[in-house]
Amino acid sequence: VTFPQIFQENGYETAMFGKLHFGNNPKGVDESMILPDQGFYLNPDFIDTKGDTTTITGYVTDIITDLTLGWLQEKRNKEKPFMMMYMHKAPHRPWWPSPEKFAEFTNKEFPEPETLFDDYKNRGTAAKTAEMNLLTHMMYSHDSKIRPETLAKMEGKVLPVVEEFPNSFYGPYNRATAEQKALYDPVLDSINDFFYNNWPKMNDTEKMKWKYQRYMQDYLGSISSV
């Protein structure tokens, strides 16, 4: 038994919008629009109460917010108590800010934490072995938005070597419409041009600093829409 079922059984109208991440068939909800699995930031698919899947054009944070407010303000039975779940995808990795936020936050520089270069010498085994190091684990395409063709042109000059997920750049990118790509591309061009021209000349300290900025720019750009 889920807690929405308990609310429903006690006379509440129930609704759920966004990322469930525990299967795609929520129980005990009168109306739902759920992202399949993790979902996508751009033009995401949603599974409705009947189990049908539809693609909605736009940015996932805006869409989930609009669906939630639409039900809350217009669709629910105002004579009944209600239980509504409003569940954002952001800021789950890989981070894809909206086109506007991508341009805005890529131009920002963020303070570095004192622990950026922590060597974890005095930490436990779990902390030492977790794959959470920006330099050695953060992926070039998946996380930093380096196009696969940029990496290919660099002919082995991209060190350290970091294993990528399949289709980690173009999977999300190719969901964008032509109009959306026109907004993303100038920013992606600037990121890739800088990487191509500077990465091979950087030392590990400089590489860590650059990856930290790319992480913060995309993470905060994604969460700022919430």
Residue ranges of model-derived segments:
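Formylglycine-dependent sulfatase
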Residues: 1-226
